[in-house]
Amino acid sequence: MAFTQIQYEKVYATRIIRFNRPEARNCIGPVTHRELIEAWTDFRDDADAKVAVITGAGDKAFSAGGDLKAGAELLPNDPDEIAAHNRGERPGVLGPSRWTDIYKPIIAAVNGVAYAGGLEWACFADIRIAEEHASFGVTCRRWNIGLADGGTQRLPRIIGMGRAMELIITGRVIDAEEAHRIGLVNEIVPSGTSLARALELAEFISTLPQPALRTDKEAAVRGYGRPLEEGLRIEAECFNRSIFDSATIEGLRQFRERDHPDRRTDGAPRTPGIVRS
């Protein structure tokens, strides 16, 4: 795959998808849109790919959103295309941002501004790691351009309706500290280190058994916002799909026989991220 406006890099079981237009604050145009679809399709379908990390080239921008100079080239512009877009049959305006069926983990390494469609792409991820100089905002509010790549749906799910509506309606830009305080960002790291931290986390996630991890993500994504009874039905369906997997049988064996690094030291399971005194 030869790309000109993104970079697609394989690092063991991790795939880095990088917006690569630093001279234009990594904004997304028609070529970027097509290349993003190709890269995300490869990640989704590649059995060896376990985690994706999305980031931006340079040190100024994750992505400033859509390339407004491209104008109508990014948009559905005839009745059939508009109807297909309304039915959810188009992948998104700025790449496959409307896809909801990637159940492999996705980490955003936010290395600068994440504005408008860039914010929407940050929300596409499951985990967001932001550099201390990063900022976030629905800056397209000034130009009378709406959110079309999941922002109106994902942002409220991440930070709650009240906070999301303030950002969506006003277009106010927030810094990394506020983003962390309201739950938009999971972790803040020094400038220039978000990709390294994301790769460290991706490497750890890649060591975990994958089947139940993915069905748990699927259950959370599909069940969110539904009535509790329906969400529990989805959870049961996903659980029953993974519980008899060979990885589960092996995991139970390792637990019973203490044949795992987390079961060999003091007899108690070790919880990642918790330091024992």
Regions found by a protein language model. Name each.
Residues H33-I37, T41, D45, L68-N111, ...:
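An acidic, glycine-rich surface segment that forms the CoA-thioester-binding/catalytic face
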Residues S97-L213:
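Crotonase-fold acyl-CoA enzyme core
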Residues W40, F62, F136, F255, ...:
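Conserved hydrophobic/aromatic "anchor" residues
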Residues D59-S63, K69, Y115, G137, ...:
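Short, active-site-adjacent cap segments at secondary-structure transitions
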Residues I129-A134, V185-E237, R241, S246, ...:
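C-terminal long alpha-helix characteristic of the crotonase
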Residues M1-F62, A72-L74, S277:
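Conserved CoA-thioester-binding segment of acyl-CoA-metabolizing enzymes
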Residues I17, R21, L36, I54, ...:
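Terminal peptide-recognition signature
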Residues F3, D46, G65, Y103, ...:
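Acidic-histidine catalytic/liganding microenvironments
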